[in-house]
Amino acid sequence: MKVLVSPMSVAEAIEAIEGGADIIDVKNPAEGSLGANFPWVIREISELAKKYGKEISATTGDMPYKPGTASLAALGAAVAGADYIKVGLYGVKNAEEAYEMMVGVVRAVKDFDSSKKVVAAGYGDYYRISSVSPLDLPEAVAKAGADIVMVDTAIKDGTSLFDHMKIGDIESFVKLARDNGLMVALAGNISWNHIETLKELSPDIIGVRSIVCEGDRSSMIKRELVVKLMEAVHG
């Protein structure tokens, strides 16, 4: 189980890298759950992380249902140096729209560099934003050629993934992903009391920010908290 940590700046990226995070995820929480950062920020953090042998992911935003816009944004993240390109399917209402979004994104990214991984991200609190259910995503995004399916939370109000999806539904999501040949990632205000449950669910990747910040998700990432998390996950 790899740990993905989401810094907002180069200074935070250094904390995450030196704390031992597996994947450095470049996002901009000021623009939403999967808010996009600027290409030059992605590039700078990518160049830094690669020196330490770390992989980089980058979010393209909580996207409306606009496949062309999503494809262009995804290519931008790929060109800027991201190994994983993560697309938030915020405005997507059903499996058919998810397929249409992701097939364009996959082509844009893979035509540029076939080694890069495409991540389709749904939301555990989908019912609060009138979005597609995560359980409808694995088959559709696998058919589109995505590599990873993820679930996060859209509204960052202190509630977690586990407040919005039953354990059985998360288990089903993980199984559907694996049955469709996808890697699977779980995120959404993960806290210390979720770690053992996550080990049992055994996703390929967990995504965090709040748990490794000195205060809430808008405060600074601290390397000692990243170290503590890595020990908890792999201990």
UniProtKB/Swiss-Prot annotation:
InterPro entries: 4HFCP_synth, 4HFCP_synth_arc, RibuloseP-bd_barrel. GO terms for biological process: methanofuran biosynthetic process. The active site is at 27 (schiff-base intermediate with substrate), 86 (proton acceptor). The keyword Ubl conjugation does not apply. It is an enzyme of class 4 (lyase). Pathway: Cofactor biosynthesis; methanofuran biosynthesis. One of its GO terms (molecular function) is carbon-carbon lyase activity. Keywords: Lyase, Schiff base. Pfam families: 4HFCP_synth. Belongs to the MfnB family. NCBIfam families: PRK02227.1-3. Catalyzes the formation of 4-(hydroxymethyl)-2-furancarboxaldehyde phosphate (4-HFC-P) from two molecules of glyceraldehyde-3-P (GA-3-P). This is (5-formylfuran-3-yl)methyl phosphate synthase. The lineage of its organism: Archaea, Methanobacteriati, Methanobacteriota, Archaeoglobi, Archaeoglobales.
